[in-house]
Amino acid sequence: MGEAVGEPSASGSGSCTGRSRRGCGRRAGRENLIGEHTDYNDGFVMPSALPHQVAAVSRRERRILRLHSADVDADPVELRVADLAPASDKSWTAYPSGVLWALREAGHELTGADVHLASTVPSGAGLSSSAALEVRPLAMNDLYALALRGWQLARLCQRAENVYVGAPVGIMDQTASACCRGGHALFLDTRDLSQRQIPFDLAAEGMRLLVVDTRVKHSHSEGEYGKRRAGCEKGAALLGVDALCDVPYADLDAALERLGDEEEVRRLVRHVVTEDERVERVVALLESGDTRRIGAVLVEGHASLRDDFRISCPELDLVVDTALASAALGRRMTGGGFGGSAIVLVEAAAVDAVTKAVEDAFAAAGLKRPRVFEAVPRRGAAPGLTVSRAASPACTP
């Protein structure tokens, strides 16, 4: 079925089992079943966690942050804690160092650390590899006895990515990586981080969810992602609401009419409002046991991302078109867009046929072979707890 994503090992000097280390954190990547580009609009999302990244961490009293990644062919990087500042680092180290900056900015007096990272989350695949790189605060939380809860760590990681790295991402990735449970999808209200764990055991129902990494890379900080976010904020301002999640689905036509000739903004608003409704529809279908019917909702979601939000690409469209022609139950792109991955819902018996059809289509188009693997919902870095929409966020580490 193509390549598998396994559990990484923080081997060598950073081994999680080594006596010299004093902490080990685990954080997951994620796939998002439905709810794309809704998190920074205070809407609903529904991610599940993928296999973990591992970080081995030890505390240093010297104010030096020493970073090493098993996935980067380079010597360890040493940074002075006092020199950490937004826009000071544009390499992969910006993600873990940004979290230390955010923790210190929030008033937590930390010294330094040795950090060794290992990951199987593909970079640029739309699977939250950046959030996985922020694994270290989970171990730091224990090492320094900070007593921060999962949702607080998620907020700090988001601030690190927004301010320190310069990527205008929402809160979904960080919360999913921290709070997802095995065998479940996380129904998350990104406005207040209230959440509900929805059972999502496809194997028990004779189905599988495949992730197809097109190997086309993207970068959120290169402009297009930010343009969409700015357009959504403009739409909310024109409609007189705090965020687009405040536009009821039943009032969408009236809202679009109020936007007049702002065609680009109209498209963005239409996607966000209809996507929120799609998330709620998928939740209802899963809770009623109508799991196969979510495939049609995934198809709708891809059309909206392609035609209204305009963040798909030829490689992603090739995956979804080929999969649907090969008897897939549903498919759509996932992640920030402009490359990355698609998810494909299939009957278990059709996994090999659909995988081969996609691989053959890429070969015929002269493209690099896609990376195909099964998405089995895993536990993230911390268990999630069910809370009501009006209650306080409740994912505890």
Curated annotation (Swiss-Prot):
The keyword Chaperone does not apply. The gene is galK. Keywords: ATP-binding, Carbohydrate metabolism, Cytoplasm, Galactose metabolism, Kinase, Magnesium, Metal-binding, Nucleotide-binding, Transferase. Mg(2+) binds at residues 130, 161. The record marks 30 as: Transition state stabilizer. ATP binds at residues 69, 124-130. InterPro entries: Galactokinase, Galactokinase_bac, Galactokinase_CS, GalKase_N, GHMP_kinase_C_dom, GHMP_kinase_C_sf, GHMP_kinase_N_dom, GHMP_knse_ATP-bd_CS. It is found in: Cytoplasm. Belongs to the GHMP kinase family. GalK subfamily. This is Galactokinase. GO terms for cellular component: cytosol. HAMAP family: Galactokinase.
